[in-house]
C-alpha cells in the first residue's frame, strides 16, 4: 500500500474525536493561536521553522490542524515567538513571555508525583484516558508526548495541562462557570 492509497482510505487530516455536549479540548485552538502569534511577530512559516528547529512544512501542518505537536515542539515554538507555551498549547496563562522560557523539564516527575499522590496505578490511569500503561510509563520515564495526550492525562488527574506540561500556571484550573450561579437567598431561588 502506498501513501496515495492510504490517503484515499484515511484522508489527509488527523482528526480528534470530540464528545458532543462536553467542552472541547483546550489544545484544539492551538492552530489559531499559533497563526495569531506568528503573524503578530511578523514571521513567515519558513523563518519560524528555522528559528524553532522544525522540519519543512511542520508549521503549515500544525496551523492547518493536520498535525498535533509534542509539548517539546510547542515549547520551542513559544520561545521562538516570544509567547508562553501554556498559552500557545492550551490558552492558559498570558500571551506575553517577557524573557520567560517555557520548558518541559520536570514533566515526568510532575506526572509521577500527581499519580502517586492520587494513589492511581498506571493501569487505572490508562483506563481513564484510553492510553496503555506502557505509554504512561514512557512519559513518566521522560518521553515526550503530544499536547493532546498530556491534556487527556491532566483531565483524568483533574489538574491543569499547562502545569503538567510546562510547570506554568496553577496546578489546578479554576472551575468553569457554566449555567446559572447558585441562589444566594431564598428570594433569589424563586
Regions found by a protein language model. Give the residues of each.
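Arg/Lys-rich, glycine/proline-spaced intrinsically disordered segments
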Residues: 21, 175-183
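Short C-terminal boundary/hinge segments that cap the last helix of small helical domains
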Residues: 82-97, 158-174
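Short, basic-rich loop-to-helix N-cap that marks the start of a DNA-contacting helix
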Residues: 65-79, 142-155
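A short, Lys/Arg-rich alpha-helix, primarily the initiator
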Residues: 3-40, 94-118
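Short basic helix-loop element that most often maps to the first helix and adjoining turn
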Residues: 32-51, 76, 107-128, 152
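Conserved hydrophobic/aromatic packing and binding residues within compact polymer-binding modules
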Residues: 34, 45-49, 59-62, 88, ...
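Recognition helix of helix-turn-helix/homeodomain-like DNA-binding domains
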Residues: 53-69, 130-145
